[in-house]
Amino acid sequence: MTDLLRHAVVRPLAQHWLSNSRSSWRSLTSPESSGSVSVPGPDPDRILLVGGGISVGWGMSSHDDALGGYLARSISTATGRGTVIDVVTDDILSGSAELPFRVTRILRTADAVVITPGDVDAILFLPGAIYRRRLENALDQMTAAGPANMRIFIVATPPLRTVIALPRVFRPWAARLGAALNDRARQLCRERRNTIFVPFSPSGIAGREGTGRTYSAWAELIAPSVARQLDSCNDRSIR
């Protein structure tokens, strides 16, 4: 599919569906765009969860009941320590030259950052080169703003059929584009010592019917990679 066809035909159709379909997440409630969740315990890890898509918490009124809360509890279970997760649902791949101030402020004391892909219409219509450039820009700024030992985790763009009930006509190109974006993200992670790619292929009910019942399962797919890296940082200086 050419970029011209993608932007001239497919993108408007997909945006119309996302705005009007009863299967879309858009009409669901969601928490405030930023918030904090915590699990008490010794020597707590401080984590920034940032991005659109699954971080937003569609279907929930509180981040404690959405991905942020479940991720904090899963990581604490694995590490035996406390966990504090600051959730910022700004789409850092939107093309803005600079990260929002609230993101850079949190980064100053973060042990780890978990980046989730943005909304389907913001991500899957990006040419691969632009996606890589925007992601690289965000990673450069995060690395500069955070402590030297901070780890950054890029959660894969999932097969969209597993998180949203896409119309059949969109599924083939969505699968191809998602795979291409993940290839770009993996390449960036290989080039950076502090950046880890986290595979993410959930199962279960997609779309509105699954939202709110799947955050626990999604967190279980992400938490092990984060917990292992946090446990491996024996020289953490920001505790």
Predicted feature residues:
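N-terminal secretory targeting modules
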Residues: M1-L48, V226-R239
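Alpha-helix N-cap and loop-to-helix initiation/capping positions
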Residues: H63, L126-R134, V169-A180, G210-A217
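Short acidic/His/Gly/Ser-rich catalytic and metal-binding motifs that mark active-site loops
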Residues: A122-L124, L160-A165, A206
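Alpha/beta-hydrolase-fold catalytic nucleophile elbow
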Residues: T116, V155-A156
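Conserved SGNH/GDSL esterase-like catalytic core that processes O-acyl groups on lipids
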Residues: R46-L48, I54-R133
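Histidine-centered active-site loop/cap adjacent to the catalytic His
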Residues: L181, A206-R239
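A short helix->loop->beta-strand "cap" motif at the edges of active sites that frequently abuts
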Residues: G146-R151
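Substrate-gating cap/lid alpha-helix
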Residues: V163-V198
